[in-house]
Amino acid sequence: MEIMKYAIPGYEDVTAEYLLGIFGNPIKHTLSPVIHDTLSDALGLSERYVPFCVEDEELSHCVKLAYDEGVLGLNITVPHKQHVMETLVDVDIAAKTIGAVNTLVRVEGGYKGYNTDMPGLAKALETEGIALKDETVIMLGAGGAARAVAYMCVSYGAKQVYIVNRTFARAQAIADDMNAFAGKTVVQAVASEDYKSIPDGKYLMIQCTSVGLHEGDGMPFDFGDAFYAMAKAGVDLIYNPAQTPFLKEMAKLGVPAVNGLKMLLYQGILAYELWNDLTVSETLTDKVYLALQDAIYGKKRGDNIVLIGYMGAGKTTVGKALAGKLGYEFIDTDLYIEAQEGMTIPDIFEKKGEAYFRTLETNVIKELREKTHCVIATGGGLPLRKENSDLLKEVGTVYYLMADADTTYARVKHCTNRPLLQCDDPYAKIQAMMKERGSVYARACHIRVRTDCGTLEEVMDEIK
């Protein structure tokens, strides 16, 4: 294939039934192959993802060449996100409004352009419990992905958006376009020297500049702690390094904040779904996210398999079967503690209290960091301590086993050894505790797996 002349070193000889790829310059450090090849391998699809280094003057030729040679789909990155629109047979309305395309999908006669950055970031925010409806937002910077961020804010119903930028005209151009799209004034441009004109309040703060990418970078704007303390949540679109000066400032101020890795993840997932007309499961999405983390930051956990989740999720049943299948040792942390203490869990609760028991759990996890080749089933309350959930991710890959309330109740209603269910209405207790703990479990795990809609073998296949 002639298009392979543009493949970067290491990819020239890639073969598959279908090719996917990305056009950009420079492109050698892209992480997109991690996303898409992980998906193809997991789904059993004969597709391979190739980075292509394409110069500006070759863009039109390469888009036509890729289509003629059957390339299934393409991502587009800098510097081509705007100019590529001239080569397409159609452009999605969101991409037109944003003025940038990052995904090409085969249609009759050529490619159609989409922008998955915007919905990718929206999905990333959703997973962090951040809703944009009626939100007030401060955007720092008006370059790069800022147009997609502003479009996302307007599309998802933000009440007010301030774009702070050193070059006022650039921020104003985005504000004008987004307000025209909204049909009302939602977005306001603010020159960086006028940042104090933003009313006091609490804002979702999104860092859209490239400041923080390089060692020695400072804050995107030197506005002082009082300004950044207006953030009630922070997002930095940069994902490498994992902790930018902006994110460190958020941490210092006690503001919950995340980097841009999940945006990278979800924009890639959405592109893959468009190319293949399928839906990627949350379990597979989590596996791709873990692969990205390993590729960027390095693997920082043991080879054990750790199972967390609410009582009745199947941690013991799945854990024992999986350990047998893999030839691993099976460890149940509750039984481990009972053996150490010489009494049952209910007795520990009754005689020494829950706080004492939770401390025992923490000590057990510290011991288990030295173990290898184990499947570890944890007590339902063990990940509730932040210290415990952090330690678990050092022990091994953490899987959150999930089941709905009806399934859970059916599994545990006859159990007499569960202290937390010794109440008048155990079903209501289950519902309340699952709601309370669900987000904690999700943050404590690497990968989510449902155990209420498949066989034991199918559940084990999702894990290993």
Predicted regions and their residues:
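Conserved lysine of the Walker
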Residues: 315
